[in-house]
């Protein structure tokens, strides 16, 4: 009985936090916010299309560790270790300088008003749009955490690139996201790149991989650990800089670069979703947008909780 009561209390608190988020949160206090963010992101993505994937990844990593609170952006301080150097994020997340540039411009225009957590949410949406993907209404009103959680970032809440389908399902379920949400959000791998160290085991040892695909990837990813670890390969071979459904088509051909990608189509319960998204771009776009909105609702700080950081890299 106690467990049921506690669960109901958690659900009530979550729904209250979500209710405080809305698209028009800055309509009066910072009306040009969306325009300023879009301009900076557009310039960054035009200069380097891969940056769109990086900015989207920042939002995912932030939300999965203690909620969408901007904690990922914090540098180390004497009192805590930041999340940037945690296992899942070290040498993986990037784009912080783009967020810094947006924050600088927004602070000049609307000082002390817009949170870094909300800037992450908007940049994720704009990055997808600028690379040809779907748009969605970004709910705003998050506040920033005053600390980071290095231990939580290393606790497995962010699934590793070598993982099982059941672990993926469970990790997303723990965040309030369904299996459908997980498969749709995995479609973000239709853009971006991965380092050799994350897919070496798959291209040399996996059985559920297209042989010619594996051989082609081995040319730039030596079998020896420590050799060429940081060399990169596109997650989507055909259209790496366009947000489409090519990722799912690759899975049907056993050409998923990461183990955590190919497990989505490997004679399991998510096969039907992969097939559906590979055939229907609009269905993928619809479910991806819905899942992004749900992900943005993960444990936000609202009301008087947290703060509005003046600099995204450090607490006030």
Swiss-Prot record:
The record marks 57 as: Transition state stabilizer. This is Peroxidase 67. Keywords: Calcium, Disulfide bond, Glycoprotein, Heme, Hydrogen peroxide, Iron, Metal-binding, Oxidoreductase, Peroxidase, Pyrrolidone carboxylic acid, Secreted, Signal. There are 73 peroxidase genes in A.thaliana. Its cofactor is heme b; Ca(2+). InterPro entries: Haem_peroxidase, Haem_peroxidase_sf, Peroxidase_pln, Peroxidases_AS, Peroxidases_heam-ligand_BS, Secretory_peroxidase. The active site is at residue 61. It comes from the Eukaryota. The keyword Nucleus does not apply. Its main location: secreted. Binds 1 heme b (iron(II)-protoporphyrin IX) group per subunit. It is an enzyme of class 1 (oxidoreductase). Substrate binds at residue 159. Disulfide bonds join 30-110, 63-68, 116-312, 196-221. Ca(2+) 1 binds at residues 62, 65, 67, 69, 71. GO terms for molecular function: heme binding; lactoperoxidase activity; metal ion binding. The modification Pyrrolidone carboxylic acid is found at residue 20. It is found in: Secreted. One of its GO terms (cellular component) is extracellular region. Ca(2+) 2 binds at residues 190, 236, 239, 244.
């Amino acid at each position: 009985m106690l467990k049921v009561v506690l669960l109901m209390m958690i659900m009530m608190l979550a729904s209250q936090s979500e209710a405080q988020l809305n698209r028009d949160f800055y309509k009066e206090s910072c009306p040009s916010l969306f325009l300023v963010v879009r301009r900076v992101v557009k310039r960054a993505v035009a200069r380097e299309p891969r940056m769109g994937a990086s900015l989207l990844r920042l939002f995912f990593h932030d939300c999965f560790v203690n909620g969408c609170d901007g904690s990922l952006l914090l540098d180390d301080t004497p009192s805590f270790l930041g999340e940037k150097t945690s296992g899942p994020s070290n040498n993986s997340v990037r784009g912080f300088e783009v967020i810094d540039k947006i924050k600088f411009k927004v602070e000049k225009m609307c000082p002390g008003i817009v949170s870094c957590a909300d800037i992450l949410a908007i940049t994720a949406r704009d990055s997808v749009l600028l690379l040809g993907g779907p748009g969605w209404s970004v709910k705003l009103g998050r506040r920033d955490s005053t600390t980071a959680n290095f231990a939580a970032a290393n606790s497995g809440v962010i699934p590793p690139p070598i993982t099982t389908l059941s672990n993926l399902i469970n990790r997303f379920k723990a965040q309030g996201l369904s299996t459908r949400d997980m498969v749709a959000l995995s479609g973000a791998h239709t853009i971006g790149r991965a380092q050799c160290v994350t897919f070496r085991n798959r291209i040399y040892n996996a059985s559920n991989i297209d042989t010619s695909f594996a051989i082609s990837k081995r040319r730039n990813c030596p079998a020896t650990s420590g050799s060429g670890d940081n060399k990169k390969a596109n997650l989507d071979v055909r259209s790496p800089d366009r947000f489409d459904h090519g990722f799912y088509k690759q899975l049907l051909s056993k050409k998923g670069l990461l183990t955590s990608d190919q497990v989505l189509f490997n004679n399991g319960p998510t096969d039907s979703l992969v097939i559906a998204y590979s055939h229907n771009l609009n269905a993928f776009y619809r479910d991806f947008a819905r899942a992004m909105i749900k992900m943005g609702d993960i444990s936000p700080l609202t009301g008087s909780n947290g703060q509005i950081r003046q600099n995204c890299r450090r607490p006030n």
